[in-house]
């Protein structure tokens, strides 16, 4: 009923829009095409979060400003950890959205992880945020298949001066936010900027320190993690930027900085983790006329001292699995814009590189040493390098029709494959401030670094396992069973005909059953005629059993019973057809996007090692073979044959106790060690789904604004024929995101005095498949509020309350319960 109410309200607002006359104005965006253009002319669906919103909504993590954007899911995993999902499946750890700050990628290249708390993002220094929905591959290249989030900072020419902001807040755990120990959020931020009178030189400095407590986990989770998680996280960043503008046609910007964080992260593979790393970066950007070039480099390092390094809370009970990854990244890009007649043209080149060192002990030999950490194991030192070249043309076919064509070729050196990502948009300008867009695009992507290079032993999902990424194929060219039978090592040592393969020889079964058969047969009628211990352990009897031994084939059960090899990484594609409408109609803004997306050749993690169990049908063969052997050893007479058959039947009965349940596992040829379950990746053929994003905004007055938006997916769970598999296949693919999302709210932002805003976010229930955090996710409605008071243009007080009503929820099952949090901030500008 609530969903119907939200949708009815939304449609009512939307219906009023159609009667409003357009006016000559237009919101400008940069990120859709890497050059300035009106939002209604952009070839992609875009949203802009402006300076007024940023200024009036205090946050200690600017990612929170994205939570009301249509088509974007912002998952708050903990007190200060957020993950961004645009038009794609959601992950706990990774994202398929690229995050930029002034053109520099701040989501990890290749690994595709974004942690705003460990960047130099600052609310004091943000001018606006642009969100581009849908494929960005034709412009931004690899791993931008779902969209781009671009944070754009203030320059010292438009925004000189010194600003400070002090924030303090709390989390509602067991008690209220004001309860003992819950008021544990603090942040101090500084921005100083200046420029000369001629506007040719300027600089700015940003500094920030923050700390926060954490939301508590439930008792069941705490039993697996050894108690509650980190008591307090902290982080800081300092950066300086120089601006040189000797003329209107030349601008050079150089930036350097450092950021660090000690805090929590979550992963579907490894669950809760403590992270401790430091990131140093440098960026140089130049614009000369129509030519733009940028180079950036960064280095993220973990502490040298093992006692200070990150670790995973519940991968093992006896040995801490360390969480470290030293990453070096660099990016170089160049773009040139020109106009030929009625066609605007942009061409560009770029290069992205990242290398990884997870500090695996290459000398490890014992299971304990192998399971001590180093996520990339034998793949440590691997790199991901992508070269790309692209173009985009915008041709005015008539006064009201534009054709935008783009394409990009990327070479993925880590898999030695290349791919072309095309895009075409036909724009119909229904008025100066409205347009209809028809778009067809194909994004190219491949596995991220974690999917490719993972290579280690661990205890993910509570079971001993070994994960191997798809950089290397796991095969079963020489398959054999690793047995879980007690005493199997002694049996193998005593057996001259021990069989290593997909079965077990009769003599091994004989030796394995001896400890229970000797007392059992001694107490039977056989014991009246035969010295059972001496007989069954007689070398002559053993030699006879060996001579008559045969192989009992096992039955493979569970996953991958056909012993198919895992798949290696390759190019995947996402093809999207989209119809979009965007308009700024007087006081109204409206955007409607309807799309169909087809994913091809995508990867998912699966168990690839089957279990082995003995077939019950072999009991008769065992009884006959051993009965004959024992009878002959007892002389071959009638009594000997009867006693021999009784003993043979006894061994068959003992064998039956071993059937019906797995007694071993078949590991891949590339296994670290035998026994733990193998996980590997499989490439699926194709899935298809539809989606829609609808957004409205109404400026009731210059200071009062209302918004409502709705996002819809036709399907979020795929199986069998949906993914190109047979009806008997157990494989599934999950987008891990709800089908329905509704967001609405209002804001009041005057130039002085009181200000505030109220918003709600609704999503329907769904079932997630996220490793540790799999399970049912209930529907939820979350209300947020913020209010403040501007004492003057220099002094402002603000309060931001998340989850105002205090109804706790989890992003996914097993994650922390997110209750109310509040932050009060005092901002002063000199």
What are these regions (language model features)?
Residues 158-160, 165-275:
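Periplasmic-side early beta-strands and strand-to-turn transitions of outer-membrane beta-barrels
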Residues 104-133:
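Short acidic/polar hinge/loop motifs at secondary-structure boundaries
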Residues 26-57, 80-83:
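N-terminal periplasmic "start-of-domain" segments of outer-membrane beta-barrel proteins
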Residues 6-8, 193-201, 208, 698, ...:
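Conserved C-terminal beta-signal and adjacent last beta-strands/turns
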Residues 165, 396-400, 584-589, 594-599, ...:
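Gram-negative outer-membrane beta-barrel transporters
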Residues 224-345, 349-354:
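Outer-membrane beta-barrel domain signature, strongest for Gram-negative TonB-dependent receptors
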Residues 38, 63-105:
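Extracytoplasmic beta-strand/coil segments of soluble accessory domains associated
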Residues 294-296, 302-304, 471-677:
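Membrane-embedded beta-barrel scaffold of Gram-negative outer-membrane proteins
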């Amino acid at each position: 009923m609530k969903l119907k109410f939200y949708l009815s309200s939304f449609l009512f607002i939307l219906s009023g829009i159609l009667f409003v006359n357009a006016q000559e104005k237009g919101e400008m965006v940069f990120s859709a095409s890497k050059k300035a253009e009106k939002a209604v002319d952009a070839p992609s669906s875009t949203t802009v979060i402006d300076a007024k919103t940023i200024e009036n909504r205090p946050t200690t993590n600017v990612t929170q400003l994205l939570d009301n954007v249509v088509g974007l899911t912002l998952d708050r995993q903990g007190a200060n950890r957020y993950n961004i999902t645009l038009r794609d499946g959601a992950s706990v750890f990774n994202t398929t959205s690229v995050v930029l700050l002034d053109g520099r990628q701040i989501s990890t290249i290749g690994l595709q992880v974004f942690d705003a708390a460990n960047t130099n993002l600052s609310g004091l220094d943000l001018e606006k945020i642009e969100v581009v929905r849908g494929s960005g591959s034709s412009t931004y290249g690899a791993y931008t298949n779902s969209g781009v989030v671009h944070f754009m900072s203030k320059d010292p020419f438009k925004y000189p001066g010194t600003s400070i902001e002090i924030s303090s807040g709390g989390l509602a755990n067991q008690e209220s936010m004001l309860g003992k120990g819950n008021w544990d959020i603090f942040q101090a931020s500084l921005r100083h900027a200046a420029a000369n009178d001629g506007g040719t030189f300027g600089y700015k400095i940003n500094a920030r320190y923050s700390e926060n407590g954490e939301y508590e986990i439930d008792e069941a989770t705490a039993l697996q993690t050894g108690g509650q998680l980190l008591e307090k996280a902290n982080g800081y960043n300092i950066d300086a930027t120089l601006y040189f503008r000797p003329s209107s046609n030349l601008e050079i910007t150089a930036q350097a900085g450092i950021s660090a964080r000690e805090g929590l992260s979550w992963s579907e593979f490894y669950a809760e983790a403590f992270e401790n790393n430091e990131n140093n970066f440098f960026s140089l950007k130049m614009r000369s006329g129509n030519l733009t070039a940028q180079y950036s480099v960064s280095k993220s390092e973990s502490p040298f001292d093992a006692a200070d390094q990150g670790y995973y809370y519940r991968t093992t009970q006896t040995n801490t699995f360390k969480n470290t990854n030293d990453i070096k990244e660099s990016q170089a890009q160049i773009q040139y814009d020109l106009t030929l007649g009625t066609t605007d043209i942009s061409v560009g080149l770029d290069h992205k590189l990242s290398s990884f060192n997870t500090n695996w002990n290459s000398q490890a030999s014992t299971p304990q040493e192998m399971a001590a950490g180093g996520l990339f194991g034998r793949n440590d030192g691997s790199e991901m390098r992508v070269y790309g070249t692209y173009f985009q043309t915008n041709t005015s076919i008539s006064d009201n029709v534009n054709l935008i064509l783009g394409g990009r070729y990327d070479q993925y050196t880590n898999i030695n494959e290349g791919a072309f990502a095309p895009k075409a948009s036909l724009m119909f300008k229904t008025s100066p401030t409205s347009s209809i867009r028809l778009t067809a695009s194909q994004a190219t992507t491949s596995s991220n670094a974690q999917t490719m290079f993972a290579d280690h032993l661990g205890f993910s999902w509570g079971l001993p396992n070994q994960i191997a990424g798809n950089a290397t194929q796991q095969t079963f060219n020489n398959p054999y069973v690793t047995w879980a039978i007690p005493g199997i090592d002694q049996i193998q040592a005593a057996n001259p005909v021990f069989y290593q393969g997909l079965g077990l020889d009769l003599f091994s079964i004989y030796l394995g059953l001896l400890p229970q058969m000797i007392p059992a047969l001694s107490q039977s009628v056989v014991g009246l005629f035969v010295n059972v211990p001496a007989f069954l352990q007689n070398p002559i009897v053993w030699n006879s059993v060996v001579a008559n031994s045969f192989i009992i084939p096992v039955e493979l059960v569970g996953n991958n019973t056909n012993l198919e090899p895992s798949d290696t990484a390759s190019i995947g594609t996402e093809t999207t057809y989209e119809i979009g409408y965007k308009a700024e109609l007087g006081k109204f803004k409206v955007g409607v996007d309807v799309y169909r997306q087809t994913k091809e050749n995508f990867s998912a993690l699966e168990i690839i090692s089957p279990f082995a169990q003995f077939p019950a049908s072999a009991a008769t063969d065992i009884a006959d073979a051993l009965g004959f052997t024992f009878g002959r050893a007892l002389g071959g007479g009638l009594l000997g044959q009867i006693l021999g058959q009784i003993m043979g039947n006894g061994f068959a009965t003992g064998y039956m106790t071993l059937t019906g349940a797995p007694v071993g596992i078949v590991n891949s040829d590339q296994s670290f060690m035998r026994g733990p379950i193998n996980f590997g990746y499989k490439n699926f053929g194709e899935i298809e789904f539809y989606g829609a994003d609808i957004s409205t905004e109404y400026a009731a007055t210059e200071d009062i604004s209302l918004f409502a938006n709705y996002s819809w997916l036709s399907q979020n769970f795929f199986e069998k024929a949906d993914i190109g598999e047979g009806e008997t296949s157990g494989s599934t693919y999950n987008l891990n995101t709800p089908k329905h999302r509704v967001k609405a709210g209002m804001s009041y932002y005057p130039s002085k005095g009181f200000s505030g805003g109220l918003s709600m976010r609704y999503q329907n229930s769904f079932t997630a498949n996220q490793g540790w955090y799999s399970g049912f996710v209930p529907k939820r409605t979350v209300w947020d509020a913020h209010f403040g008071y501007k004492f003057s243009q220099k002094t402002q007080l603000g309060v931001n309350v998340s989850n105002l009503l205090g109804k706790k929820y989890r992003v996914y099952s097993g994650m922390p319960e997110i209750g109310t949090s509040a932050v009060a901030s005092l901002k002063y500008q000199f």
